[in-house]
Amino acid sequence: MRIALIGTGMMGERMGGRLLDAGHELAVYNRTRARTTALEARGAAVAGTPRAAAEGAGFLITMLSDAGAVRATAQGDTGFLAAPGERLWVDMSTVSPAESRELAAEAHRHGVRALDAPVSGSLGAAVRRRRRRRRGGGAL
């Protein structure tokens, strides 16, 4: 399965590595291109826009710092919501419940199913695979 990962900072890079370890085809996008080099060296395709990362992916993950960063990568002609095709979007970003509901409603208008699944824990917890996750969303 092709997976798109938007946000390859400290946590996103670790998650991307785990996805590659599991044998998934991975496309990544990060606003700072230099943050994608470690995953690219391991076989991930680096996209020039969030939309390009999402194209052809049945599953998309965002791991971003706040709702503004999620909106910046989701919206507009180059945003991942503009990519054609159906997909499941799992937002693991640091976003309030109200913002998460707003983003999910926008995704729904674009035919994208959305789940909110923020993670908590430190980088050390991520390395040890000990992050805590919560999930929320409508019926899939």
Where are these regions (language model features)?
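A structural signal for hydrophobic residues in beta-strands of small regulatory alpha/beta folds
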Residues: A47-G48, I61, L115, R134
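A general structural signal for well-ordered alpha-helical segments in protein cores
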Residues: T36, A57, A67-V70, S100-L103, ...
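Active-site-adjacent beta-strand anchor residues
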Residues: Y29, M63, S93, R134-G136
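Rossmann-fold dinucleotide-binding core
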Residues: T73, V95-L140
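Alpha-helical structural signal in soluble globular domains
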Residues: L39-R42, G76-G79, A83, E102, ...
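Beta-loop-alpha module in the N-terminal Rossmann-like domain of NAD(P)-dependent dehydrogenases
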Residues: L60-F80, S93-S100
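NAD(P)+-binding Rossmann beta1-loop-alpha1 motif at the extreme N-terminus of oxidoreductases
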Residues: M1-F59, A83, R87, M92, ...
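Short, well-ordered alpha-helices that flank and scaffold nucleotide-derived cofactor binding pockets
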Residues: G17, D21, Q75, A105
